[in-house]
C-alpha cells in the first residue's frame, strides 16, 4: 500500500488522473472485439453555437455514469465525441463573434472564417469535457463539417433521392426573414404576443356589407377567397357569391369549408397566400390562385396607389389600418394574446413563402414512425409521449434546404444543355464529398451546369450521427462495411428532451428510410438544468452558470455528484447545498479510507489478492457477516439500477450505505476489535479488517462511475496499480450469503440508537462510560454483546425477560 497523503487536493489529482487515463488509453475502444461484447453510444455532438453551460455538463455526465458502469461490467465501449459545427447556429455565432454578415462577403471567405472560429471553440469544448472526466475515446472524434461527415451526409441524401424519399418542389414553406432561409417545422417555436383583431368591412358584388376579423390586414392584397363554415346559418345565403376586398377592390369567391371556426371573430375569414397553414390547405383544396406579396427580406412587393410597396410587414400593417380607419372600413379592434410561430434561432415571426426547396418525405411515414417509437426502449418511459405527440402533429414534410453558406452542400447541379434545361444532375458516390460550386458532374463542363447554391439543414447531417461513426449509411452503402455492420444499430442514444422532436425524430426517420431499422435499442433522455430559483437560465437574467468557475471551486467529482442526484429526465435546479454535500462526501471518503487503511498491513498479501468469495470463511464475526450480506444486497440493487439507467437511485443507495451503515455504525462498532490492542480476539480482529478492506474497495467501485478522480486516487493508494475504471472491474459477489439471524445485528443497531439518543439528550459524550445496559425484547450473541459494549462504552449488559419490542434501561456511574 502506498503512503497515505495527509490531504486530498482535487485540483492536482483531477488533472493528474485525466492525463494518466489518456496516456494509458483506459477508455480506448478495441475494434477487434466481437459485436456481442460492445456497448455502442451515439453521443450527442454539441452544437458549436456558443459557450458550453452547466446544462451541458449536467446532461453529458449522466451519460458518462452509464458508460463507465458498462465498461466496468466488462463491455468494450464505443464512446465517440463529435462537434456539430455547421449550419445556421454556427453561422450566427461567427457573425456575432466577428461582427460580420455572411451576405456581405465572398462565400469562400466567410467559410474560411467559420472554420477558424469552430476550431477555436471546439478546443474549449474539448478541454471542458476532459476536465469533467467524460470517458470518451478521443480517437473517435468527428466534426459534422469534416470531409468524411460531408461524404456520409451527401451519401444519405443520394440514397434517399434514389429511393424516392427526397423530392424537390416549388411549394409553400416556412421562411425566416431575418436569417434569410427556409426552415423546417421543428425549427419553429410558438411565442405569445400581444396583437389586435381587426374587424374589416368587405362588400358582396351586390353591395351587401360583410365583416371579417383578421390579425393580418397587410395581407389584404393577397386575399384570394372568403370562407364560412357550411353549417353556419348566418352565411349560407352567401353561397356561390363573390366578395370585393376593401381598398384593393379585387373580386374573390365566397366559399364554404369545415375548417372555419364559427366562434372565432365573425365566423367569416379571408384566405390569403399565405398567412398560416390553413391558408395553404384552402389554397390547395379549392384550387385558388397564388398572390405573393411578401419578399424573402420581409418587405411588401405590391406596387399600388396606396404606396405600400417596399414597406416592412409591420409598417404596411400600420398604414393599411390607418387607411381603413380613414375610410370607415375598420369597425372594431380588439387586443388579443396571439400565438405566433417564430424562428427558434432568430426569434423572428415566420412567413410562408412559395420557394423551390428539397424535402424528405415524412407525412407518409407517420404510422411507421409511431411504430418505431414503440419499439424503442425509453428511459424514462414518459418521454416516449413527446415523440408520439410530435409525430401526430406533423403537417409538413421535412424541408432540408437552407439558403446559407457554412453547411453540407447538396451534391446537385442543374443542366443548361440544350434539350435538357433544368434537368437535375447528381454526383456519383465515388465523387463524394463534392462542392457543386467547385466540382462538376461526370461528363459535364462548367458552362453546362448551374450548381445548387443551398446547403442542407444541419439536422440532415446530425441525424446520421450514428453513421458518421460507423462510416456507412446502410449495409449496401458504406465506406467501411465491416465497421458499419459491427457498430450499427447502436445500443444507446443519450440526449436532452428539448431535441426529441429534432435529433431523435430525424435520426429514427433516416435509419428507417435507409435500413428499415431503429438506429439504437435504448434512448435515455435528460432534463434541463434550471437556476436555483427554478427559472430557466438566460444571459439576460444573468443567472447562467459557467462550468469553469464551478470546476475551479468544487472540482469535477462534486459537479458530477450534483448531476447524479437528479433523476433521469427531470428538470433540476442548480443547488449549492447539493454541491456542498458532494464536497462533504469527497472529504468523508478520503478520511474513511485513511482511517481504515491503517489496519490493512495486518492482512496477508495473499488474502488481499483474492476475491471475498474465496476467503469468505475468514470473516467469522456475526456483525461482519451481516455487513457483508448488506454489502452484497447493495451491489445487486445498485447494479440493477444502473442497468436500468437509474443512476440517481444507484448513487442514493450507495451513499446511504456509506454514511448510515458504514461510517455512522460499522466503523464505530468494529473500531475496538480492529485495533485489538490487547490481542484478546485475533480472529475477530482479522474478520473486521477483512470486512473493512472489502467494503471500502466495493464502495469505491460503486462510487467510481460518478466520482472517478477521488475513487481512482484512493483505489491506487489502497488496492491496485491498475485503474479502477478498467474494463471488467465491477463487483461480482455471485450468491455470496452468510446464513445468520438478522435480528441480532439489527437489534444491536436499535440498542445503539437508543443509547446515542440518551447521551445526546443529557449532553453526554458519545464515549461517556455506562455502568449497565438492561435490555429487554432481544438477547444478543456473545460476539454481538462484545461489539455493543465497545461501541457504547458499557461495562455490563444484562438481558431481561422478553418483550414485544426492544427496550433499554441505562444506568450511569454515580
UniProtKB/Swiss-Prot annotation:
NCBIfam families: PRK13208.1 (NF009687), valS (TIGR00422). ATP binds at residue 539. Monomer. Pfam families: Anticodon_1, tRNA-synt_1. It comes from the Bacteria. A motif ('HIGH' region) lies at residues 46-56. It is an enzyme of class 6 (ligase). It catalyses: tRNA(Val) + L-valine + ATP = L-valyl-tRNA(Val) + AMP + diphosphate. ValRS has two distinct active sites: one for aminoacylation and one for editing. The misactivated threonine is translocated from the active site to the editing site. One of its GO terms (cellular component) is cytosol. Belongs to the class-I aminoacyl-tRNA synthetase family. ValS type 2 subfamily. Its EC number is 6.1.1.9. The gene is valS. Keywords: Aminoacyl-tRNA synthetase, ATP-binding, Cytoplasm, Ligase, Nucleotide-binding, Protein biosynthesis. GO terms for biological process: valyl-tRNA aminoacylation. HAMAP family: Val_tRNA_synth_type2. A motif ('KMSKS' region) lies at residues 536-540. PROSITE patterns: AA_TRNA_LIGASE_I. It is found in: Cytoplasm. This is Valine--tRNA ligase.
Amino acid at each position: 500500500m502506498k503512503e497515505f497523503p495527509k490531504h486530498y487536493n482535487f485540483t492536482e489529482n483531477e488533472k493528474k488522473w485525466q492525463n494518466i487515463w489518456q496516456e494509458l488509453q483506459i477508455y480506448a475502444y478495441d475494434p477487434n472485439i466481437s459485436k456481442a461484447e460492445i456497448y455502442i453510444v451515439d453521443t450527442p455532438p454539441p452544437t458549436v453555437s456558443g459557450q458550453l453551460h452547466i446544462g451541458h455538463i449536467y446532461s453529458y455526465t449522466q451519460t458518462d455514469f452509464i458508460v463507465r458502469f458498462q465498461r466496468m461490467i466488462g463491455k468494450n465501449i464505443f464512446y465517440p465525441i463529435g462537434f456539430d459545427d455547421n449550419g445556421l447556429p454556427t453561422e450566427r455565432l461567427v457573425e456575432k463573434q466577428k461582427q460580420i454578415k455572411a451576405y456581405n462577403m465572398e462565400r469562400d471567405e466567410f467559410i474560411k472564417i467559420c472554420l477558424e472560429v469552430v476550431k477555436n471553440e471546439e478546443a474549449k469544448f474539448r478541454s471542458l469535457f476532459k476536465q469533467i472526466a467524460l470517458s470518451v475515446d478521443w480517437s473517435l472524434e468527428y466534426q459534422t463539417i469534416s470531409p468524411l461527415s460531408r461524404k456520409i451526409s451527401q451519401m444519405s441524401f443520394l440514397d434517399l433521392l434514389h429511393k424516392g424519399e427526397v423530392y424537390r418542389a416549388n411549394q409553400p414553406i416556412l421562411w425566416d426573414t431575418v436569417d434569410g432561409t427556409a426552415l423546417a417545422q421543428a425549427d419553429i417555436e410558438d411565442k405569445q404576443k400581444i396583437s389586435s383583431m381587426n374587424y374589416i368591412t368587405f362588400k358582396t358584388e351586390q353591395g351587401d356589407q360583410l365583416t371579417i376579423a383578421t390579425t393580418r390586414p397587410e395581407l389584404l392584397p393577397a386575399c384570394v377567397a372568403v370562407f364560412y363554415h357550411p353549417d353556419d346559418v348566418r352565411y349560407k345565403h352567401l353561397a356561390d357569391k363573390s366578395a370585393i376586398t376593401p381598398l384593393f377592390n379585387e373580386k374573390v369567391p365566397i366559399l364554404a369549408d369545415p375548417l372555419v371556426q364559427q366562434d372565432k371573430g365573425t365566423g367569416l375569414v379571408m384566405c390569403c397566400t399565405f398567412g398560416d397553414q390553413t391558408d395553404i390547405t384552402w389554397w390547395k383544396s379549392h384550387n385558388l390562385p397564388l398572390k405573393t406579396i411578401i419578399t424573402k427580406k420581409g418587405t411588401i412587393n405590391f406596387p399600388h396607389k396606396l404606396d405600400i410597396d417596399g414597406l416592412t410587414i409591420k409598417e404596411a400593417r400600420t398604414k393599411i389600418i390607418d387607411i381603413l380607419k380613414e375610410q370607415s372600413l375598420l369597425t372594431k379592434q380588439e387586443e388579443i394574446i396571439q400565438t405566433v410561430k417564430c424562428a427558434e434561432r432568430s426569434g423572428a415571426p415566420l412567413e410562408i413563402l412559395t420557394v423551390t426547396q428539397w424535402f424528405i418525405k415524412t407525412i407518409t411515414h407517420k404510422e411507421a414512425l409511431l411504430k418505431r417509437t414503440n419499439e424503442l426502449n425509453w428511459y424514462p418511459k414518459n418521454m416516449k409521449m413527446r415523440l408520439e405527440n410530435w409525430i401526430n402533429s406533423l403537417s409538413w414534410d421535412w424541408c432540408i434546404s437552407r439558403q446559407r453558406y457554412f453547411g453540407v452542400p447538396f451534391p446537385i447541379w442543374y443542366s443548361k444543355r440544350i434539350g435538357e434545361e433544368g434537368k437535375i444532375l447528381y454526383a456519383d458516390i465515388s465523387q463524394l464529398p463534392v462542392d457543386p460550386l467547385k466540382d462538376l458532374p461526370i461528363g459535364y463542363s462548367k458552362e453546362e451546369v448551374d450548381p445548387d447554391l443551398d446547403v442542407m439543414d444541419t439536422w440532415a447531417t446530425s441525424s446520421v450521427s450514428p453513421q458518421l461513426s460507423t462510416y456507412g449509411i446502410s449495409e449496401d452503402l458504406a465506406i467501411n462495411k465491416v465497421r458499419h455492420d459491427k457498430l450499427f444499430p447502436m445500443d444507446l442514444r443519450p440526449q436532452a428532451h428539448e431535441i426529441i422532436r429534432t435529433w431523435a425524430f430525424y435520426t429514427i426517420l433516416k435509419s428507417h428510410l435507409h435500413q428499415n431499422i431503429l438506429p439504437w435499442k435504448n434512448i435515455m433522455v435528460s432534463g434541463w438544468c434550471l437556476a436555483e430559483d427554478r427559472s430557466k437560465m438566460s444571459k439576460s437574467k444573468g443567472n447562467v452558470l459557467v462550468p469553469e468557475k464551478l470546476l475551479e471551486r468544487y472540482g469535477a467529482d462534486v459537479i458530477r455528484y450534483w448531476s447524479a442526484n437528479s433523476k433521469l429526465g427531470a428538470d433540476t435546479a442548480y443547488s449549492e447545498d447539493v454541491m456542498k454535500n458532494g464536497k462533504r462526501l469527497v472529504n468523508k471518503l478520503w478520511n474513511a479510507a485513511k482511517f481504515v487503511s491503517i489496519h490493512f498491513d495486518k492482512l496477508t498479501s495473499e488474502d488481499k489478492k483474492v476475491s471475498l468469495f474465496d476467503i469468505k470463511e475468514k470473516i467469522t464475526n456475526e456483525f461482519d457477516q451481516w455487513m457483508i450480506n448488506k454489502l452484497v444486497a447493495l451491489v445487486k440493487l445498485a447494479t440493477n439500477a444502473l442497468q436500468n439507467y437509474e443512476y440517481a437511485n444507484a448513487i442514493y443507495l450507495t451513499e446511504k450505505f456509506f454514511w448510515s451503515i458504514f461510517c455512522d455504525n460499522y466503523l464505530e462498532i468494529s473500531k475496538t476489535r480492529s485495533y485489538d490492542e490487547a490481542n484478546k480476539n485475533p480472529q475477530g480482529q482479522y474478520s473486521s479488517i477483512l470486512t473493512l478492506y472489502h467494503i471500502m474497495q466495493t464502495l469505491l467501485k460503486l462510487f467510481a462511475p460518478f466520482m472517478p478522480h477521488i475513487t481512482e486516487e484512493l483505489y491506487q493508494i489502497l488496492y491496485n496499480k491498475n485503474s479502477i475504471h478498467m474494463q471488467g472491474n465491477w463487483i461480482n459477489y455471485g450468491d455470496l450469503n452468510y446464513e445468520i439471524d438478522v435480528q441480532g445485528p439489527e437489534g444491536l443497531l436499535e440498542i445503539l440508537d437508543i443509547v446515542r439518543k440518551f447521551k445526546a439528550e443529557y449532553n453526554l459524550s458519545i464515549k461517556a462510560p455506562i455502568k449497565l445496559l438492561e435490555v429487554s425484547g432481544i438477547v444478543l450473541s456473545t460476539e454481538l454483546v462484545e461489539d455493543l459494549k465497545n461501541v457504547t462504552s458499557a461495562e455490563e449488559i444484562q438481558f431481561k425477560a422478553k418483550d414485544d419490542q426492544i427496550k433499554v434501561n441505562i444506568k450511569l456511574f454515580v
